[in-house]
Structure formats: C-alpha cells, structure tokens
Amino acid sequence: MTAELLIEQFLNGLQFGFMLFLMSAGLTLIFGVMGLINLAHGSLYMIGAFSAAATFAFFNSFWLSLLASFSCAAIVGIVVEKTIIRKLYNRDHLDQVLVTFALILFFSELVRWIFGAFPLYLDVPELLNLSLIHISEPTRQVL
C-alpha cells in the first residue's frame, strides 16, 4: 500500500465520518430540543440530492442545482413538519418512530417512482475539483 493510497483512504474515512456526524447530530438535536424522534430527516438529504441532480441535468448549472437542492429540501421539510410532524409532538415515541419510518419508505419510493432506480450524476465545477499535495482526493470531499 502506497502512502498516497493510505492518505486517500484516511481522507475518505474522515469525510464519511463527518457526514455521519452531521446526520447523527441532526437526529440528536431534533430529539434533544423538540423531544421528537424523526428518523426521516435523512430522506430530506436524499430529496435535496436528487433535486440537485435533476436541476443540473436540465439547466447544466452546478450553482443553480445547489440552490435548488437547499430550496427543495427546505420546502419539503416545512410541508412535512406542518402536515405530519406537528401531530406527533404529544404522541408516544413509538408512534413517532413508526410514522417517521413510514415517511422514509414513502420518500424512498417517491424518488424511485420519479427518477427511476438508476443513479443520477452531477458534474462538479473545476473550482471544487482541485487536488491536494499530489493526492487525487477532490477538494470538495475535504470541504
């Protein structure tokens, strides 16, 4: 194993760990502040990602797709909170888990129905595709 490969794998693990930390911090924050177990907040992450890929495929603009990603995830999150999640605030935690797990299944199937079962790709601008010290780890993953 070369030193470059070792550093690449270390950076991949660090990036993946940060992503897991952010998602688990969101779950902990929602439960700690609101007393609500919302397992479906990762589905909003997925909706944002698919809306970004679809916007990029249509307009071919990374920055517009980034804006669409945040906007779409925020709008869907607000609608879900006002229509479904608010009714769960005074309910038992088991009810919260069941409903939010049902939301995961619903959003997963909705995305599969709209976009299909194949992955979508997004070209990243060269600004975020720089290499670090002769290592092929993209800057966007470190950021």
Task: Walk through the language-model features, giving the residues of each.
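Short, Lys/Arg-rich, polar N-terminal cytosolic tail immediately upstream
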Residues: M1-T2
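Single transmembrane alpha-helix segments in multi-pass membrane proteins
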Residues: L6-T55, T83-D95
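Alpha-helical transmembrane segments of polytopic integral membrane proteins
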Residues: M23-V33, A52, V76-G77, E81-K82, ...
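Ser/Thr-centric signal marking residues that sit
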Residues: T28, T100, T139-R140
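Structural signal for alpha-helical transmembrane segments and their membrane-water exit/capping regions
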Residues: F31-L36, F70, L110-P119
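Alpha-helical transmembrane segments within multi-pass membrane transporters and channels
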Residues: N60-I104, L110
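Extracellular/periplasmic helix-loop junction at the C-terminal end of a transmembrane helix
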Residues: L98, L105-L132
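Single conserved hydrophobic/aromatic residue that forms the stacking wall/gate
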Residues: I133-L143
